[in-house]
Swiss-Prot record:
Residues 16-25 have a biased composition (Basic and acidic residues). Belongs to the methylthiotransferase family. MiaB subfamily. It comes from Bacillus cereus (strain ATCC 10987 / NRS 248). GO terms for cellular component: cytosol. Catalyzes the methylthiolation of N6-(dimethylallyl)adenosine (i(6)A), leading to the formation of 2-methylthio-N6-(dimethylallyl)adenosine (ms(2)i(6)A) at position 37 in tRNAs that read codons beginning with uridine. Residues 440-503 form the TRAM domain. This is tRNA-2-methylthio-N(6)-dimethylallyladenosine synthase. Monomer. PROSITE patterns: MTTASE_N, MTTASE_RADICAL, RADICAL_SAM, TRAM. [4Fe-4S] cluster 2 binds at residues 221, 225, 228. It is found in: Cytoplasm.
């Protein structure tokens, strides 16, 4: 670690952000701004599991004759939260619409992980202001991760007074009450809980499709990487009980779903909060191997918690797919230390070795940040060399974006933007080079494809994904949508494969 990095790290841990005048009177008394000091205070209170969600009689037909619209930003967790909110709206009697002009309620389900995502939300709120003028009865709401940031709520209260309601990630189940309050209140209704929520089971859902489904296995994150806002916006780690997860997946399988993605901010930490049983992600995956469903995958994993038992179970195959998304963020041990990732370059490479030994055909993908405070040219080159050594199939790459309230935001962001862009360009060139090399190896191979639907670029072509998450385009009857088929790969591109159908749907044993 060089001297600049050591000083920056010390400053991040010691400096305190000045409190600004805000609108905290609008918050419930339990709300606290997202600061490292407060957010690290993980309470020892037992997480309650509520299994009796239901709508009181006062909400029956509450939304009859009304329509709702939800715009979702961010990760799969947000997408799944939107499915839950759509389920609650539908239970209230609302109908969905794809037009804000037709909607009686517009919700923006937001993402806080990068500044660009927040800018998009405030831009959309600006567009909705004109719609509110034309339709004063329209209810506009902001929910999701941005709502957990007090500075964001302050900005909404100051500059976006046409917003009727703001609520966070921990109280989605209270949507009916929030809607009712917003409908009859002259002021913006703000219901944001800093205290992490309980685990609410049996919430209604309107799933996006009938082929693949997302299933939450846990909520929150306790890792506190210095650049990441998620531990503040999603709260402490809380795991669902295994019996509830297995029951939900069995129900989805019985209803014809072919693929399940297990969701969590850090799925590898699943079960670490259980006090009555020793049960982790490896144990859950071992039980899910016995469920009659074609594919099980998970996201997102943290290298720190990726244990040998999980690797052993994944090596058994079956319905457990060979694709693993394993964010590394940097190839430099010094940068990883400043990021508080709690593993080294050597640890990561050893983990990759174990995975490839247990699962010889494993496909690995990753996330990488460039331009983190004080990142040197040499440290960036370590990231490039690690990428080559692992041989990732692809990566999500990002320029570092400071998030207010995180330790990294207190570090001096002293890597010039032109340097950040140049590094990102070089990294992306490497990502693209390896991606086409990896895809070229599929030429002539026959792969199993789960058919999602029509190609976005050509309705005469079908598109689907392999077990290793490769997009495959091919011509076939639309009756095969939702089926598992065999496709011979005839051509490879950087981000997709082309092929020919070689046989009828596969029977899943």
């Amino acid at each position: 670690m060089n001297e600049q990095q050591r000083l920056a790290s010390q400053q991040a841990n010691s400096s305190k952000k000045k409190e600004e005048k805000d609108y905290s009177k609008y918050f419930e008394s339990v709300y606290q701004p997202p600061s490292l000091k407060e957010a690290k205070k993980r309470g020892k209170e037992e997480v309650k599991i509520e299994r009796d969600f239901g709508l009181p009689e006062e909400f029956r037909n509450f939304g009859t004759g009304r329509k709702f619209y939800i715009r979702t930003y961010g990760c799969q967790m947000n997408e799944h939260d939107t499915e839950v909110m759509a389920g609650i709206f539908t239970a209230l009697g609302y109908e969905p619409t794809f037009s804000t002009e037709e909607a009686d309620v517009v919700l923006l389900n937001t993402c806080a992980i990068r500044e660009n995502a927040e800018n998009k939300v405030f831009g959309e709120l600006g567009h909705l202001k004109a719609l509110k003028r034309r339709n004063p009865d329209l209810l506009i709401g902001v929910c999701g991760c941005m709502s957990q940031e007090e500075s964001v709520v302050n900005k909404i209260m100051q500059k976006n007074q046409h917003v009727d309601m703001v609520f966070g990630t921990h109280n989605i189940h209270r949507l009916p009450y929030i809607l009712k309050d917003a409908m009859f209140s002259k002021e913006t209704v703000v219901e944001v809980w800093s205290k992490e929520g309980d685990v609410i089971e049996n919430l209604p859902k309107v799933r996006r499709g009938d082929i693949k489904a997302w299933v939450n296995i846990m909520y929150g994150c306790d890792k506190f990487c210095t650049y990441c806002i998620v531990p503040y916006t999603r709260g402490k780690e809380r795991s669902r009980r295994p019996e509830d997860i297995i029951q939900e997946i069995r129900h989805l399988a019985a209803n014809g779903y072919k693929e399940i993605t297990l969701l969590g901010q850090n799925v590898n930490a699943y079960g670490k909060d259980f006090e009555d049983i020793e049960y982790g992600l490896g144990d859950l995956m071992d039980e899910l191997r016995k469920v009659d469903i074609a594919r099980i995958r998970f996201t997102t994993s943290h290298p720190r918690d990726f244990d040998d038992h999980l690797i052993e179970v994944l090596g058994k195959g079956g319905n457990l797919v060979e694709h693993i998304h394993l964010p590394v963020q940097s190839g430099s041990t010094e940068m990883l230390k400043i990021m508080a990732r709690k593993y080294s370059r050597e640890h990561y490479l050893e983990l990759v070795r174990k995975i490839k030994e247990a699962i010889p055909n494993a496909v690995l993908t990753t996330d990488i940040i460039v331009g983190f405070p004080n990142e040197t040219d040499e440290q960036f080159e370590e990231t490039m060399s690690l990428y080559r050594e692992v041989g990732f199939d692809t990566a999500f790459t990002f320029i570092y974006s400071p998030r207010e309230g995180t330790p990294a935001a207190k570090m001096k962001d002293n890597v010039p933007m032109e340097v950040k862009k140049e590094r990102l360009q070089r990294l992306n060139a490497l990502v693209n080079k390896l991606a086409i090399e990896k895809n070229n190896r599929y030429k002539g191979q026959i792969v199993e494809v789960l058919v999602d639907g029509e190609s976005k670029n050509n309705p005469e072509v079908l598109a689907g994904y392999t077990r290793t998450n490769k997009l495959v385009n091919f011509v076939a009857p639309k009756s095969l949508i939702g089926q598992l088929v065999k496709v011979k790969v005839t051509d490879a591109k950087t981000w997709s494969l082309n092929g020919e159908l070689v046989e009828e749907p596969i029977e899943v044993e």
